[in-house]
Design a protein with these regions (language model features):
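Long, contiguous binding/interaction regions
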Residues: 2-4, 8-41, 53-79
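Short, well-ordered beta-strand segments in beta-rich or mixed alpha/beta enzyme
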Residues: 42-46
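Helix N-cap motif at beta-to-alpha junctions
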Residues: 48-51
Length: 79
């Protein structure tokens, strides 16, 4: 089973990398890009057939390591 995990900063948390990209896009003439947010994307191959068990494992991975839940939020999908 494959897990796709997206981790982003929570709303209200300053994203300096996103701001830098937004300014760079503006300087390149892409003036219609605004509120750029940068995050992380991960794919994990899980050796698990049971979807409920895989979901529980991915949630634990996110809570314990993949996301800093104080400032980041995460979402995932299983395939």
């Amino acid at each position: 089973m494959k897990a796709k995990v997206h981790v982003t900063l929570k709303q209200g948390i300053l994203d300096p990398q996103g701001k830098a990209i937004e300014h760079a896009l503006d300087s390149l003439g892409f003036r219609n890009a605004a509120n750029v947010r940068v995050g992380k994307y991960m794919e994990l191959d899980l050796d698990e057939k049971d979807k409920a068990k895989a979901e529980a494992q991915v949630k634990q991975m996110c809570e314990k390591l993949l996301a800093n839940t104080i400032i980041e939020e995460y979402r995932y999908e299983l395939q």
